[in-house]
Each structure stands twice: as C-alpha cells, then as structure tokens.
Amino acid sequence: MALLQIAEPGQSAAPHQHKLAVGIDLGTTNSLVAAVRSGSSEVLRDEQDRLLIPSIVHLTEDQVIVGYEAGKLASQDPQNTIISVKRLIGRSCTDVQQRYPNLPYQFSATENGLPLLKTRRGLLSPVEISAEILKKLTALAEQRLGGELTGAVITVPAYFDDAQRQSTKDAAKLAGLKVLRLLNEPTAAAIAYGLDSGQEGVIAVYDLGGGTFDVSILRLSKGVFEVLATGGDTALGGDDFDHLLAEWIVKKSTVAPQNDREKRQLIEVANQVKVALTTNDKIRISYAEQNLEITRDEFNSLISGLVKRSLLACRRTLKDANLTPSDILEVVMVGGSTRIPYVREQVGEFFQCTPLTSIDPDKVVALGAAIQADILVGNKPDSEMLLLDVIPLSLGIETMGGLVEKIIPRNTTIPVARAQEFTTFKDGQTAMSVHVLQGEREMVTDCRSLARFTLRGIPAMVAGAARIRVTYQVDADGLLSVTAVEKSTGVQASTQVKPSYGLTDDEIANMLKSSMEHAKEDIQTRLLTEQRVDATRVIESVYSALQQDEDLLDDNELSAVKNALVSLQKLIQEEDSLAIKQGIKMLDQATQEFASRRMDKSIRRALSGQHIEHIK
C-alpha cells in the first residue's frame, strides 16, 4: 500500500533485514574477501572458483586489469604491472626508493614527497592502485552476495602507522567502499579462531606471507585485544623460499634462465614444487628437458636459514614485550607459507606449544574480518561466540510492538556514537517515550531496562511525518548518553546511564547464552510482532483516510475495503505471520483505487484557482 504505508525516514519498509558487509584481507601478495553467510564466515570465490585474488594491477591506456590476468602480463610489461603495492602505501617517495631500490617502476614525487608511479595511464599514486584492487573485491562480493555492500572491515598489519592506515581508508573511499573499521591482521586471525571467547592470556600471531613476515604479541583480557609488541622482517616471505628452490634447480640442472620470461617460468616451477612438498616426501621436477628429484628433507635444509631468521624476529619481539616463549598461551599461524610442515615444527618447538592450524592460513585473516564486519553492521550473530568487548551487550531502543531495535551492537569499541531516526505511529502524536535497553534478545521483555525518558513538544502531524533523531553515545569510561531531538523544532530530551553497572561477567555470559538458546523462537516472535505492527499501522491509516474521504467510494467499493479491514483485524489476533502479511496484501489491493482517487483529489485541490501559466 504505497500511498498509505509508513516507514521510518531513511529506512526501507523492512528495517530489520540482514545487511551485507564483508571482511577484506588486503594482502601484499594476494587479497581475499569474506562474509558471514548463514551464521558462519566464509571466503567468497570468483567465477573460476578461486579464493585468492593476486594483488596485481596491470594498466593500459584504456583499461585496468586486476588479479590473475594482470599477473600473466608482469613479465611482458613490468613497468605497467604493479605488484605488492601494499609495500608502497603511506610511504614517502624517498623511503620507497631507499627500501626497494630494485623495483622496475619509475617514480615521481608530489609536492608533499609522496610517490607517484609513471604508467601508461599517467601518474598514479599507491592509493589509486590499491583502490583498483578494492574495486575488484567489492564487485566480487556484491556479485556473490547479490546486493550492495553496507561496508567492510579491512585488515592492516599491526605495525602500520597513521599515514599507512589513512592511505588504506583513502583507497577504500576512492573505490566507493565504506570502511566500518580497520582491523589489525593478528587480531582478525585471533577472532577467526574464537580466541576472543573468554580466554585470558598472551597469544602470538606468526604471519609468514608471500612477501613479508610479521609477528605480533597480543594480550587477551575479557575479549579485548591489546597489542604488546610487533616485529618481523619485511624482506622475508614465501617468495624467498621460491627463489632458494629456483637456485637449487639451476644448480642441479646447470641450466640458467636467459630472459625475464624464463626467470618467471622457473619461479613458477619452484612455487609448484614448494606447494607439493607440503604433502609429499619427495617430488620429481621437469625442467629444461631434465628430470630432477628433491626430498622434503633437502627442502627443509634449504629454507632452515630463513626459518631461523623468522624465529630470531620472534625472540626480539618477545623481548620488546618483556616476555619469553613459555609465556605464550597460543600461537596462531597466518599466511600460505605456514603450511610448510618444517615451519610449523620449528614454530612449535620455539613457542613450546602446538600452533593453531585448523583454519586455512590464507583465509584466517579475512574470516576474522568478516566476523567483525557482521557485528559492526548490527547483524545478529548466529554463532555461539561469546565475545566480551568494551561494550559487552548491545544497546537498543524499544519500538512499536515491544520490539528492540539495536543502536550499538555488542563488541563495539568505545568511545562510539550511533544515531538513528524514528517517527510517530499515530496522527497528532506530540510525545514519544524513549526506552533504553541492553541485551541480545528481540523483545523488550527479554532485555535489561536501563532508562526511560519522554520527548515532549513534537508538533502535531500525521503519523510518520515527524522525524526524531535518537543518538546513543558511549564515552571512554563506558558512560552512555542518550539524546532524542525532534528535527523540525530542535526540541530535545536526554538521559545518562552506566550500562555495565551492576553486571558481572557471568551475568553477561548468561544473557548471551540465553539469546542463543532462544534465537529461533525470538526470530519467529519478532517476525510475528513486526507483521502485527505493520498491519496495525496500515489499518489506522486506512481508517483515517476513510474518515476524510469515504465519499470517494461507492457502496460496493466501501464494503470491499471494510471487509478487508475486518479480515486483517481478525488475522492480527492469530499467530500466523504469513497470514497477516497476506492480509496486508489483500487490503492493499482493496484500497489501490481509493488511494489513486485520494491522490487525484489532493492534486486538484493543490491546483485549484491557479492559472496554467503559473504552474511550472
């Protein structure tokens, strides 16, 4: 019933539908995008069923190619094929040229000293190139999820400084992607493993990617992560393992590559051998018309020096945190190179515990980011994860029918402010009661009441015309301020409350557990209540319209409308949400002609007495 239906300003007629949000692992070598679907986090695959999107951008005069196809052009046109742009983002031109003197790119500096790459498409910044990768990931996600994204959580290394973080945000903005939050990569990995679900202690995240090695030491306390120290080696990664294998192959075969294309082919062979040795004790290699064989033990000997380098970085990082390996509760493995059995073995010996490897190390960061994104957009998690964060339980407001609308979801980092607009339910309504609630259940009766106050002085209008903006603001001390403002007059009312006051951790956990145990029945109750509220709203609107314009209908038409009204009123008393929905549809059909005539009447009244030359 388009003419008579009322929706809150800025919202659709279905304000409680699932919002689409993703987690993005914007990696040096590869990037991934993940989302929570049917209650669990999963990485989204491209049309060829591939998880990893190479972080490679190829530029021509008239198009931008991202991913696998761009990678194929790297050896043919290295200057216009940008690889590992993450190394460049947020750095000065001087810094880039000093750190990476062998890059095949030509640089120019801006007035601020930031690097610009000279390409066929002109001068481009690392931010612009990163934006192309994010556009690719966004398009993939929207295609797979079937809708427009609300936003994304993008992961960054824990050691990224403000300039690098802001540059990442700028790249997302350029890509048309809303950043819900930048999340440290080690924190994302820990979330994916559920280490935020009540454990206490210190964890290490060992991240051996394609181009870099990072180690982070985190303290976990009641779901809150504190980064104690970060370290690593920006010149150590899985690519170095490939180069060592390539050197071994050349030495054994006595055949060296003669050009860039042969070098690239050799590296690809080495990479395939490395991957195969993770599950095989020995591998035959066909190279330069020769058949070679390498065992896993030989491979381990080749890479042992690099693995020791990574463990030295771990030792230095532990020292920075005033800790020893025995202080570490868990070790999370991240990055494709941590699949190598020798790496896992050495890391386990160093930290004196078995590393966590059950989640694909290529996926783990993206999966954790997706979980966080799902929380930040206010989707109710279906999993049984108890994540006790700074805001331990969601903060919401009572809406019609005794429903709870979440304003700030649990796990949100403070300080934070969120606002939402509401409207009146009845014609002439001049006051609104604001009921502040805490909890994860769908109904007011199942949540904790924090405060009530009344906003008075709302101008008398038809239902749905007034716009009341309700703002929830939590400061660094956990103090919640709630303010309601009627936008046309500026009249306002507010209250303050300490949401965590009087709640123990056990009580919080019990509230979360209760929400999970009753999730199915809560959703059913919510759906039924929403349909009843919608039906009541429509019925009141139709009765109001009949009082004003009943004369627009003949007796048969009026009888049909009243019969549909009576039928819907009876259905509201039932427990069948689908039947109520059908009843609303039947009333909609019965009132379509009535709505059209009312519109015509309003137009005639508006034009009455005006000359046609005055109407534009």
From Swiss-Prot:
InterPro entries membership: ATPase_NBD, Heat_shock_70_CS, HscA_NBD, HSP70_C_sf, HSP70_peptide-bd_sf, Hsp_70_fam, ISC_FeS_clus_asmbl_HscA
Gene3D superfamilies: 1.20.1270.10, 3.30.420.40, Actin, Chain A, domain 4, Substrate Binding Domain Of DNAk, Chain A, domain 1
Family matches, as Pfam families: HSP70
Any one Gene Ontology BP term: iron-sulfur cluster assembly
Origin: domain of life: Bacteria
Gene Ontology molecular function terms on file: ATP binding; ATP hydrolysis activity; ATP-dependent protein folding chaperone; unfolded protein binding
Keywords attached to this entry: ATP-binding, Chaperone, Nucleotide-binding
Family: Belongs to the heat shock protein 70 family.
Its biological purpose: Chaperone involved in the maturation of iron-sulfur cluster-containing proteins. Has a low intrinsic ATPase activity which is markedly stimulated by HscB.
Protein name: Chaperone protein HscA homolog
